[in-house]
Structure formats: C-alpha cells, structure tokens
Regions:
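Preference for long, amphipathic alpha-helical scaffolds in soluble/luminal domains
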Residues: 1-189
Length: 189
C-alpha cells in the first residue's frame, strides 16, 4: 500500500512540461529548512537527475512498471548527452541508474564515472567541508565505482573512525548559514 501511494503521488506530480518530478514542494517554504531547500519557480525544472534518477531506480527495484520511469530516464540520458552540468547531488542519484544498468551507453557511464572522480572528496580536509563524500556514491566493494575510488573510500572510513563523537554520532559539516537560527540547534542534533 505504501509503494502504491508513492507511485500515485509521483504520477500526480509529474511535470509534463519539464519531464521530471519536482525536487521540492512549494510547501517547504512554510517550515524551517536549509537554504538549498527554498522553493521558487526555478526549482520546478531542477529535478531531472535529483531526485528523478534515484526514484526511477527505486521504482525499478520494486518492479513498478510506469511509462514515467522510461520518460524520466530518457530525459536524464538526453541531459547527459547535451553536456548538462552534473552537480554532486545529481551524481548521488545517477549512481543508482548506473548500478541498475538503466544507462546502457558506456560513454555516458564513463562521463558519470569521470564526474565522480573529479568531484569526490580526496583528503580529510575535503571531508571537513560540505561535498561529495565517497560513501554517498559508493555503496560497497561490489559497486561498479569502487575500484576507481578505493583510496578515497579507505580515507573516508579512517576519517569517520577518527571523528566519531563519544555518543556514536558525527557532527554535521554544514549548517543553515544563519537561516532559521532558532530552529537550527534542534535540527543539528
């Protein structure tokens, strides 16, 4: 029932004009949030890769058959072929499409691999800032991306072991940059 409701929501919220799902709802502006979750008219068309690529892969994993999966995947492939900028969060979502073999064009897979290689955090100093951490794009040693990024995975695992708090958590390496100061301390925990 939960998956069926999610699929119904996706079908109801598909933007035929932009060939994607919204990355965020307009209602998000009613609540405390990080600045990157501010909704405006431009955010409607930003969901081509994020969250769409991840959604398509998840729907395939659940055996859902929907023409929107094919439409969305086709749009993603078109965007990749056009040379569209691939941001860090886009890469996180595209990895599931690559690992699920939804992107069959090896040149596009190589493009995604190269983008990950160029953007993934490579030093412990990189990990103290907001960025593309190896574990965000590499699920484990069987990942098709693991061999390209093994040193970075090992470096991040060592960093995580060194920076874990006494209670077993890790402090965020980002903030809301002064937006909703009254709500940030609760969100930070």
């Amino acid at each position: 029932p939960l998956v069926n409701k999610a699929v119904a929501w996706l079908e109801d919220n598909w933007s035929e004009e932009h060939q994607c799902w919204p990355i965020i709802s307009e209602k998000a502006n009613d609540n405390p949030r990080a600045p990157w979750w501010n909704w405006d008219e431009k955010t409607v068309s930003k969901g081509v890769f994020n969250p769409a690529a991840d959604l398509c892969a998840a729907l395939r994993d659940f055996g859902i058959d929907s023409e929107l999966i094919d439409k969305s995947t086709s749009r993603q492939i078109d965007e990749l072929r056009s040379g569209a900028e691939i941001e860090d969060h886009d890469l996180i979502c595209l990895v599931r499409q690559v690992e699920g073999n939804a992107i069959e064009d090896q040149a596009l897979v190589d493009l995604i691999r190269q983008a990950i290689r160029s953007k993934v955090s490579k030093t412990p100093d990189d990990l103290t800032n907001y960025g593309l951490r190896p574990r965000f794009v590499i699920s484990g040693p069987t990942s098709v991306l693991y061999s390209d990024n093994r040193a970075e995975v090992d470096m991040e695992l060592a960093f995580l072991a060194e920076t874990q708090c006494d209670d077993g958590s890790w402090a965020p390496n980002w903030s809301w940059f002064g937006q909703f100061d009254e709500a940030w301390p609760k969100a930070e925990k």
